[in-house]
Amino acid sequence: MDSNAAEKSSKEIIEDLQRQLLTEKNRNRTLVEELKQLRDSHARIQIVTENEEEYITNKFMKYLNQLKKEKEELALKVEQEEEYLTNTLQKKMLTIMKEKVDLENQLEQEEEFIVNKLQKQIQDVMKDKKALEKRLENEINDHRSLLKLQDEVIVLRDKIKELESNGNKKEDIDALKAENFVLGQKIIREQEKLSKVNSENTKLMSNLEIDDERNFNNKSKRNRSISFPTSMASTTTTTTTSITSSTTSITSSTSSINSSGSSSTNNTCNNNSSSNIPTSPLSCSSNSSGGGGGSGSLNNSCNSNCSNSSNSSNNNCNNNNNNNNGNSKLSTGVPITRSRSSSSNSNPCLITKIVKEGWLKRKSISSSNQETLEKRYYEISTDGEMREYFDETKQIPTSQYINLDTCFQIDIVTDNPNHPGYSDIKLYIKTNSISPVEIITFSTSSNDCNDWKDTISSLMPLKR
């Protein structure tokens, strides 16, 4: 029983051990499997971590490469922008330098133009000055020559008196009687001419008085102090008194020659008659009869004599008449103006005044054949001159002026289409150049246009 029990217990023990062994084996298997699983998971984790590390490294490398590329691109862009800015700045500098050079050239050209213009104006002023100086010298020389001639006349008269007192020759007396007869005939002719001159003077005076009254009534705006009719009356009275005094002196000389029986030699008579300077009252009358043929020469001679010496004798007046008649020429076709001579010095009765002044635009043609308007300051005086200045101070006159005695027509073109509100004034002037008529055009406001026209037309020559 005990053996059976022992066998049973050993069997159970073996079975238990076998069971335990199986459980251990199973457990060992499970552990081995777990270990394998852990190893596999560890390997997988390592692979994943390696892959992740590679991915991260690759990602960072790509990012670094992108940053490097962006850095290089930015550096290129910065260089390009710097080059562009430098190029643009250089171009701007070049354009500015060119503009500077152009402006300097323009300034030099303008300075040269202004200098040349001023030099031309100075030359014109110097020419005018020289012309005035020559005119003054000529007038002074004429005055000196007149004084010399008067002195020579006095000396010759003294010689004639000496010859008449010393000579008692019948031949000279006969010759003087013959000359006396001839001179008497010439005196008669001169008296007839004098009557004609007086009639012409009266007609001229009446015409001028009518014209002056008409102009005074029409142009009451113009203030001109002119005493022309009185001067004409004085000239006619001086001519009549001088010629009557010459006739009385001639008759008195002939009576003295016939009564006293004084004579001169033939040589002296021939020399005195051949020269232009009168030597005796008889030769004075002969020279006056030969030289005085027109009304203009008689009036001029009498006026010059009366203005030069008011206290001289009748013989001196006649001698000066003859000298002036010999030097002056007859003027028959001179147009009559409104009691205005060519200069204020030749007519002391005329007092020059400024009638109108103001700004006008004068049309001129440039070098490119285009019409340009030049604004200038003009003044019109009673001596018939229209002067041009650069400004209203009238310190710098231009070389251009218009003599209204040569103007024969004036027209107005109203409402200029190129310049609204302005009208054109056209002056037609006679010239001695190739083109006989010159047209000068001025532009001014339509309100002042008629005023300028009235002023200019009042100073134009009268149409006969």
From Swiss-Prot:
Coiled-coil spans in chain: 8-210
UniProt keyword annotations, A-Z: Coiled coil
Start and end residues of each PH domain: 353-461
Keyword Transcription: no
InterPro entries: DUF2046, PH-like_dom_sf, PH_domain, UCP036436
Annotated disulfide bonds: none
UniProt xrefs under PANTHER family: COILED-COIL DOMAIN-CONTAINING PROTEIN 6, H4 D10S170 PROTEIN-RELATED
Keyword Coiled coil on entry: yes
SMART domains: PH (SM00233)
Pfam families: DUF2046 (PF09755), PH (PF00169)
Record's compositionally biased regions (Low complexity): 234-288, 317-328, 338-347
Gene Ontology cellular-component annotations: membrane
Region (Disordered): 215-290, 317-347
UniProt-recorded name of the protein: PH domain-containing rcdII
